[in-house]
Amino acid sequence: GARFIRRRKVQKYIDFDRTRSHNCLFNFVNGIRGCGKTYGKLKDDIDRYMKGKGRFIYLRRSEEELKTLTTQKSGRLFNHVQTEYEGHALWCEANLLHIDKEVCGYAAALSTARKLKSDALDYVTDIIFDEYVIDDTTSQQRYLPDEVTAFFEFYETVARPGSRDYDVTVWFLGNAISSS
């Protein structure tokens, strides 16, 4: 007789629940371009916000990278993930990330992060550092001088170690690159 093979639904983005279950403060997720790292992490953080589990920060290296994503009116950061949230409006403007009329997160540039004040970043539980790896074979972008120190200073501004009863988890998202 005929055999029927049941196919599993192919997921179009990374599910971060398993990675989160390891309970690491810093998580590095590298994969091929377009495999759904940013989409999956935005979905994860939006879902967590909607369940009352805190806000998030979307971090990029420079302000230039944020211009079309979160700074300009109608920033396009949420364009693709919006389809997951029928009946809700997701939008970005002036580096504030919104669900309907509420602020669900913030966008920041590591290059100017020293200007941020921790009290303005209320109840942040996740930081997404998107495109943390630079592929210098295809990009004109460069790492910031003393970038690691700048990141740790930014992290301490947000997390305020010892002053909160929760941890701030960091998600470093990067494209897999080969080096010769």
Predicted regions and their residues:
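Phosphate/NTP-binding elements of NTP-utilizing enzymes
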Residues: A2-S180
